[in-house]
């Protein structure tokens, strides 16, 4: 038995302008090669773009987009008796939020080239808030996979 106590989970810090943890989580996922100031610049430009296009609070649009992309279930490969099954598993809200952020950023990076990342990210978030876009499609695909493999749920 381990003698160490379990480490407490660190709560995500909030960003300097919006004072929001979700924004900070998004910045940390945009981050590449340790360039955090660039990641902040990309996100803040995207938020400004959202503000101009929708004339709504960009933070509420961001929250709505992430809430729309967050999955309830996911599938996990489980090997049973020589064959691999895709087993549907319910996921916690923090893990779902992390997946939603990852999918949103992946979808915005895959948008057609020619525009900067802030532009792509803002349009992906606005699409996700309106319940369409590639990140929403990814969530629906995951839910369909989980529904199709519901018979294997007892392999958990």
Curated annotation (Swiss-Prot):
**Looking at the Swiss-Prot or TrEMBL record, what is one Pfam family this protein matches?**
Ribosomal_S7
Tell me the keywords, alphabetical order.
Chloroplast, Plastid, Ribonucleoprotein, Ribosomal protein, RNA-binding, rRNA-binding
Q: Which GO terms describe its biological process?
A: translation
| Tagged with keyword Ribosomal protein | yes
Q: Which family does it belong to?
A: Belongs to the universal ribosomal protein uS7 family.
Q: What is this protein for, i.e. what is its function?
A: One of the primary rRNA binding proteins, it binds directly to 16S rRNA where it nucleates assembly of the head domain of the 30S subunit.
**Protein name listed in UniProt:** Small ribosomal subunit protein uS7c
Q: Which organism is it from?
A: Zamia furfuracea (Cardboard cycad)
Give the encoding gene's name: rps7
